[in-house]
Regions:
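Conserved SAM/SAH cofactor-binding pocket of Class I
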Residues: 137-221, 227
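A short helix-to-beta-strand connector/capping loop
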Residues: 115, 197-200, 290
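SAM-dependent Rossmann-like transferase core, predominantly class I methyltransferases
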Residues: 94-155, 162-168
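Flexible, glycine-/basic-rich loop-and-beta segments that form/coincide
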Residues: 302-378
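Acidic, low-complexity/disordered tracts enriched in E/D and polar residues
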Residues: 1-59, 98, 126, 353-445, ...
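Long, charge-rich, low-complexity alpha-helical segments
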Residues: 56-104, 161, 175, 348, ...
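Conserved Class I SAM-dependent methyltransferase catalytic core
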Residues: 182, 243-296
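Mobile active-site "lid"/loop adjacent to the S-adenosyl-L-methionine
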Residues: 183-184, 221-249
């Protein structure tokens, strides 16, 4: 049975959850930091020990988060005005003896300074079903944190799943559309939107087919990006195409669905094939007329890739079935020359100008969300495009970003420490870092926004006894990279 929340049932359930403080803050406050963290690791016993009272919040935590069977009277009191029978008819609960247990995962979700949301998805016990619909997982959170949040007229959540990205889009887009090929995903997304009183258009179909002929200001997608043999074991992760072919086709088609200046962002995986550089592979997918920023965040060898996704699907890699599947998957990788699999974020922006295409390998961990960095990167690309001429760049006034630090390092020498290098780097965002020589470090130190870049270079040429023209030629490419990475900020 597909879940369905009528408007009246959604309103009643929302009232009950709000009254009980079954929210991200309410649950975290009840459980405490240690039990809440343990629950996130899949260790429920600390939460069971804390949420042991008869209060509505305790009952809902045990029922909806911990998988307990709760007595009819306790469930009725916690969910009122929604009755347990109505909740069961909606697909939320199932009778178990004299009590009730959850039939779906219903958990609170929210963002800083945002509304309290709830997300409906499948329970982990259903994970090995082909049409399993995942909840708020690591991939969903990664994409949400990387998405640009500027106000737009229209947004498309391509492959909406349980609706997480569409929920976020509802805060900054006037119209939100979600698509999915799986009826169960669409049903759960519809229930999520009804429960949160969010208006999202849902359309059924594969990839971009349901929105043929339409353009959007923003497209976000957490598509089935796991490269492997051509098969569909799980709709949420397997494309049915060989390797990364489906993703390549999707990326190539995105420009035709973007309005002028529209931005598409998606999580993606690409194969590292023997004898081929991964940027060349992904570059071949990119549509004409789009700026592109491709950020590789992880690289997995074949064994790690296969084992990770077997465990994600609930399959023990050491079981006979797990070994058979791994053998077939690894043999496919051997035949196709796959040496590794990259994972990251791909951002496209439709433009009428000559496109800027940049590939970055950023595997070092950082905590800051990537969304503000993507927004800043797009702005900086516009600025650099407007200052593409050397004369325009030299006339600009630039300021060193406040988070930038200069590092110098030395090595032991015959008479003590000997300077061997220096680097500048931001201490926020992705921690961009560039090695610099003496003149470059001095130039950055002089960037306070008071003088045009050209005058600073002239002063630098005098100080270092170098021809100005030669210093301009050597310096401007680095300056452009400093601007692109946000180390230098245009003034005024």
């Amino acid at each position: 049975m597909l879940p369905h929340l009528s408007p009246d049932a959604a309103k009643a359930l929302r009232e009950a959850l709000t009254r009980a403080r079954y929210t991200t803050d309410g649950v975290r406050s009840l459980l405490g930091a240690a039990a809440h963290a343990a629950l996130g690791r899949g260790e429920p016993e600390p939460a069971h020990r804390v949420a042991a009272d008869a209060d509505a919040l305790d009952v809902l935590v045990r029922l909806l988060l911990l998988g307990s069977v709760e007595p009819d009277a306790a469930v009725a009191a916690a969910l009122a005005p929604l009755t347990p029978g109505d909740a069961a008819a909606a697909g939320l609960l199932v009778a178990d003896g004299a009590g009730w247990r959850a039939a779906l995962d219903l958990r609170p979700y929210g963002v800083a300074d945002g509304p309290d949301w709830w997300v409906l998805s499948d329970l982990d016990a259903r994970r090995q079903q082909r049409d399993h619909v995942t909840g708020v997982g690591a991939a969903s959170l990664t994409l949400a944190a990387a998405t640009v949040r500027r106000p737009v007229g229209s947004a498309l959540d391509l492959g909406t799943g349980c609706g997480v990205q569409a929920l976020h889009a509802s805060r900054h887009a006037r119209r939100v559309t979600g698509t999915d090929v799986a009826p169960r995903a669409l049903a759960l997304a519809a229930a999520t939107f009804a429960l949160n009183d969010v208006d999202v258009e849902l359309v059924d179909g594969p990839w971009l087919a349901p929105v043929a002929g339409r353009r959007f200001d923003q497209i976000v997608s957490n598509p089935p990006f796991v490269p492997g043999p051509a098969r569909v074991e799980f709709v949420y992760r397997d494309s049915g195409e060989d390797g990364d072919a489906a993703l390549a086709a999707l990326v190539a088609d995105l420009a035709g669905h973007l309005a002028s200046g529209g931005v598409a962002q998606l999580l993606a995986s690409w194969l590292h094939v023997r004898g081929e550089d991964w940027p060349d592979r992904v570059r071949s997918w990119l549509p004409a007329g789009c700026d592109a920023w491709v950020v590789q965040r992880e690289v997995a060898d074949p064994a790690l890739h296969v084992g990770t996704w077997q465990r994600d699907g609930g399959l023990d890699p050491a079981s006979p079935a797990g070994r058979d599947q791994a053998r077939a998957w690894l043999e496919w990788m051997d035949r196709t020359g796959v040496e590794a699999v990259g994972f990251g974020l791909l951002t496209l922006r439709r433009t009428d100008a000559a496109p800027t295409v940049v590939f970055e390998d950023v595997r070092e961990p950082f905590d800051d969300p990537l969304g503000p960095e993507v927004e800043g990167w797009l702005d900086r690309v516009d600025w650099l495009r407007a200052h593409a001429d050397d004369t325009a760049l030299l006339s600009a006034r630039l300021t060193l970003a406040p988070s930038v630090l200069l590092e110098r390092w030395s090595a032991p020498g015959p008479e003590g420490w000997t300077a061997v290098g220096a680097a500048v780097g931001r201490q926020d965002g992705p921690r961009w870092r560039h090695e610099v020589d003496g003149p470059a470090a001095d130039l950055l130190a002089g960037c306070h926004g008071a003088l045009p870049l050209g005058e600073l270079v002239e002063l630098l040429a005098i100080a270092h006894d170098r021809p100005t023209d030669a210093l301009v030629t050597a310096t401007l490419p680095a300056v452009r990279e400093f601007v692109r990475h946000g180390l230098l900020v245009p003034s005024g």
